[in-house]
Amino acid sequence: MKRLNKLVLGINLLFLVISITAGCGMGKEAEIKKSFEKTLSMYPIKNLEDLYDKEGYRDDQFDKNDKGTWIVRSSMSIQPNGKDMNVKGMVLYMNRNSRTTNGYYYVDVIERQDKGIHRDNEKKYPVKMVDNKIIPTKDIKDENIKKEIENFKFFAQYGSFKDLSKYKEGDISYNPEVPSYSAKYQLTNDDYNVKQLRKRYDIPTNKAPKLLLKGTGNLKGSSVGYKDIEFTFVEKKGENIYFSDSLHLEPSEDK
């Protein structure tokens, strides 16, 4: 009888541990979603100049008279199996104090070398934004690059995350020492954002991507660290296809 009671007690304790662990996991997932939701709920921002009037997270890193600078990034990285990786993207710095924007479009070929050594061949093309139009600030002879800049749209302009709660059963990771955190979800090709990416990029795979929300810093908010979203279509040795995006507010250099 005593053995039976001990067995029942052991089983109950096991279920309790599992329940607590699952509860903590779900709680942390909700925290991660809430942390990203503050920014992603603004998507889509069709007119990027609207960001001049949008507030972001502020802490003691900001001077009291500094409205901050929004940093907008989007890039697509494609490495066919066994070949070099091609990366194309853009970064904009939108100063809310001066209401001016500058940045650059970049093209990078990361070559695979013997012994696993990589060599970058990044080229940057400075740009500015006027009346929601991105304009090169220097003469560009390559007509293809000029057209790519002219037609470029940030994911923040067409992506939509109105309801993050629809993403469920994610793979959650949290390291309080860094701190760092991430939530990964398997998507389908019917997902709205996946359709938008395929519409704009020649993605050489039919595989549906995983959505990765990853960041560092205080989950409740911090101007130190980062918050990125990534759509990972392929991730393995010698072959990678992924799209990266971020939008965050930082202290302005001009203050």
UniProtKB/Swiss-Prot annotation:
<keyword id="KW-0564">Palmitate</keyword>
<protein>
    <recommendedName>
        <fullName>Uncharacterized lipoprotein SAR0106</fullName>
    </recommendedName>
</protein>
<comment type="similarity">
    <text>Belongs to the staphylococcal tandem lipoprotein family.</text>
</comment>
<dbReference type="GO" id="GO:0005886">
    <property type="term" value="C:plasma membrane"/>
</dbReference>
<keyword id="KW-0472">Membrane</keyword>
<keyword id="KW-0732">Signal</keyword>
<feature type="signal peptide">
    <location>
        <begin position="1"/>
        <end position="23"/>
    </location>
</feature>
<keyword id="KW-0449">Lipoprotein</keyword>
<feature type="lipid moiety-binding region" description="N-palmitoyl cysteine">
    <location>
        <position position="24"/>
    </location>
</feature>
<dbReference type="Pfam" id="PF04507">
    <property type="entry name" value="DUF576"/>
</dbReference>
<feature type="lipid moiety-binding region" description="S-diacylglycerol cysteine">
    <location>
        <position position="24"/>
    </location>
</feature>
<dbReference type="InterPro" id="IPR038641">
    <property type="entry name" value="Csa_sf"/>
</dbReference>
<dbReference type="InterPro" id="IPR007595">
    <property type="entry name" value="Csa"/>
</dbReference>
<keyword id="KW-1003">Cell membrane</keyword>
